[in-house]
């Protein structure tokens, strides 16, 4: 009968720990796979975001014609395209009712938004690959027209129907988006309204001592900003909001 060769402690230890080494290798490979998967997904997401920014840049150029009016300023910002309207031309003092004289510029803004590249990407073949990428990821492209109202720092009189500048700025932005939606003949689900009162001034008034310059700065702060933006909403975000 053949005698078994004695096994040293080192050999026995190596055999008993061999599975652990194999398991560690598999774990490392799985970790590497998931890291690569995350990199690929992030790269795809960045690619989509870059294309959305290209669309916004193109749309901003289309809206530049609005700057021919002294009432309007256009700026490309991180929150999309910002259209700034001077408050004094839109509303009377302490009123949230739109001046009828503002209708022509609102008609122009609404028309340009309605016919813009961003609002018509589903009708243009050149954006089909982008829309296909978004659909395959089960994401959605959200288009938003958000109005933000701002006032100056003067307190609201006691006899006003508004309790404070928050209420006044909110009422103004709401009236503006409702009117813009009507004139542009666009669905209301694109629009939203916010009011910031005097708390997000365009010009800081604290270091202005000259009365004339102070009133000029206050006039700059009385404004309405319309943000025309697009962003990708992931499937997971939609599920979280249910």
Residue ranges and their predicted role:
Residues 56, 106-114, 173-177:
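Short, hydrophobic/amphipathic alpha-helical packing segments
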Residues 47-51, 55, 101, 105, ...:
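Short amphipathic alpha-helical segments
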Residues 100, 126-242:
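Periplasmic OmpA-like peptidoglycan-binding domain that tethers envelope proteins to the cell wall
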Residues 1-86:
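Short terminal targeting/anchoring segments
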Residues 68-70, 77-81, 85-89, 94, ...:
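Envelope-exposed proteins and targeting segments
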Residues 61-70, 99-142:
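Extracytoplasmic beta-rich ectodomain segments of secreted or membrane-anchored proteins
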